[in-house]
Amino acid sequence: MDATIRLEESWKAVLGGEFRHGYMAELKRFLLEEKQQGRQIFPRGVEYFRALDLTPLDRVRVVILGQDPYHGDGQAHGLCFSVRPGVRTPPSLVNIYKELQEDLGIPPARHGFLESWARQGVLLLNSVLTVERGRAASHQGRGWERFTDAVIRAVNEQAQPVVFMLWGSYAQRKAAFVDRSRHLVLTAPHPSPLSAHAGFFGCRHFSKANAFLTSKGLDPIDWRLPEDPPLAVERQMAPNC
């Protein structure tokens, strides 16, 4: 699998060994069989590792964990909670924007494209990196979880302090091993409409993250998003290109 994988160099240095394990060969076999049977997989193959490509290991300042990619047409592009330009903002992200506004006074963006966060050092990582079209959680238990565990371990072992935003019990269990003596671990219910009112609203994770980063001599995250994604980005991200 590693012969055909494009992975950002700092991540390749610490994760290259994962591609030599049998579970990754099994995962590759599964994905190939799914495609051969005519099943559509989201996101595109070149975007499986998009979160790692945009946020090199030595630049990670914040980690936000998701579960698996959006399974609707044109949504997923490799960053958790984020959708392509021109796609309606999903309900969980709408609630994230509401909390941002309450916390930092940032008006909700008119789009759901979070790439500018990733480029600043926010690792927007799903636990499972692929999904079958129209079938939520269809690729769970196929090996991605082991790979993304290795990603989180690599971040945890970095000397630079990092903020982990763990929303919902799934994310909190997955990152339970993070060293809280070095990193800031923020927990809250998931921003889903089903749970946001149980404690996500009012958690103020965004201001807490920036206060922690500043206290460690690190640049805070600019959580404001561009008013509109550049047209060139929209063309590049078109799902059928």
Swiss-Prot record:
<feature type="active site" description="Proton acceptor">
    <location>
        <position position="68"/>
    </location>
</feature>
<dbReference type="GO" id="GO:0097510">
    <property type="term" value="P:base-excision repair, AP site formation via deaminated base removal"/>
</dbReference>
<dbReference type="GO" id="GO:0005737">
    <property type="term" value="C:cytoplasm"/>
</dbReference>
<keyword id="KW-0963">Cytoplasm</keyword>
<comment type="function">
    <text>Excises uracil residues from the DNA which can arise as a result of misincorporation of dUMP residues by DNA polymerase or due to deamination of cytosine.</text>
</comment>
<dbReference type="InterPro" id="IPR036895">
    <property type="entry name" value="Uracil-DNA_glycosylase-like_sf"/>
</dbReference>
<dbReference type="InterPro" id="IPR005122">
    <property type="entry name" value="Uracil-DNA_glycosylase-like"/>
</dbReference>
<keyword id="KW-0234">DNA repair</keyword>
<keyword id="KW-0378">Hydrolase</keyword>
<dbReference type="GO" id="GO:0004844">
    <property type="term" value="F:uracil DNA N-glycosylase activity"/>
</dbReference>
<keyword id="KW-0227">DNA damage</keyword>
<comment type="similarity">
    <text>Belongs to the uracil-DNA glycosylase (UDG) superfamily. UNG family.</text>
</comment>
<protein>
    <recommendedName>
        <fullName>Uracil-DNA glycosylase</fullName>
        <ecNumber>3.2.2.27</ecNumber>
    </recommendedName>
</protein>
<dbReference type="InterPro" id="IPR018085">
    <property type="entry name" value="Ura-DNA_Glyclase_AS"/>
</dbReference>
<dbReference type="InterPro" id="IPR002043">
    <property type="entry name" value="UDG_fam1"/>
</dbReference>
<dbReference type="Pfam" id="PF03167">
    <property type="entry name" value="UDG"/>
</dbReference>
